[in-house]
């Protein structure tokens, strides 16, 4: 919603600016699923086990903070508008418990919040403005992600 609104130079409409969500880049759960698949290939013990892949608990951001950070790339004065809505009861705090993934398969997220925001905003800005080849940018972001994982000595990356 944000990116489409900002591409049209409009403010995104939000209901609950102080609600917290488990924001993450698509590469985070993808790395978890691929790591899990490689472990299942080696041993069927984990086959059928459910896992959550998400951000660390200390990487929480509320909606307003995320929007303010994401919108910097789009250079908007008023990136959001708060609307009243009683039609959508929502929890103020949503989070994923990734402790099982950390403990059983030694997986943890790679990106810090600021790294996730930079990657997402850059990708969408490029998508809408066609400044560089999107495939090239995507592959470059994957390389950066893998490099971070390797530098942080995550087992699936080494």
Task: Give the label of every model feature segment.
Residues 9-14, 36-53, 78, 128-136:
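Core catalytic loop region at the nicotinamide-binding pocket of NAD(P)H-dependent oxidoreductases
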Residues 26, 50, 87-108, 126-130:
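Conserved C-terminal active-site "lid" loop/helix of NAD(P)H-dependent oxidoreductases
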Residues 48-52, 64-67, 75-93, 134-141, ...:
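C-terminal "lid/loop" region of Rossmann-like NAD(P)-dependent oxidoreductases
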Residues 57:
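Catalytic strand-loop-helix junctions within cyclic-nucleotide turnover domains
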Residues 113-158:
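Amphipathic terminal alpha-helices
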């Amino acid at each position: 919603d944000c990116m489409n609104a900002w591409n049209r130079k409009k403010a995104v409409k939000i209901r609950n600016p102080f609600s917290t969500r488990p924001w993450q880049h698509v590469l985070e759960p993808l790395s978890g699923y691929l790591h899990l698949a490689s472990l299942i290939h080696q041993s069927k013990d984990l086959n059928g086990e459910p896992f959550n892949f998400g951000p660390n608990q200390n990487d929480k951001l509320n909606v307003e903070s995320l929007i303010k950070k994401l919108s910097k790339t789009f250079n908007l004065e008023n990136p959001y508008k708060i609307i009243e809505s009683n039609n959508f009861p929502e929890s103020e705090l949503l989070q994923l418990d990734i402790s099982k993934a950390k403990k059983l398969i030694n997986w943890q997220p790679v990106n810090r919040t600021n790294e996730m925001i930079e990657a997402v905003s850059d990708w969408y800005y490029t998508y809408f403005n066609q400044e560089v080849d999107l495939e090239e940018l995507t592959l470059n972001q994957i390389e950066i992600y893998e490099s971070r994982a390797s530098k942080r000595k995550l087992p699936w990356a080494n």
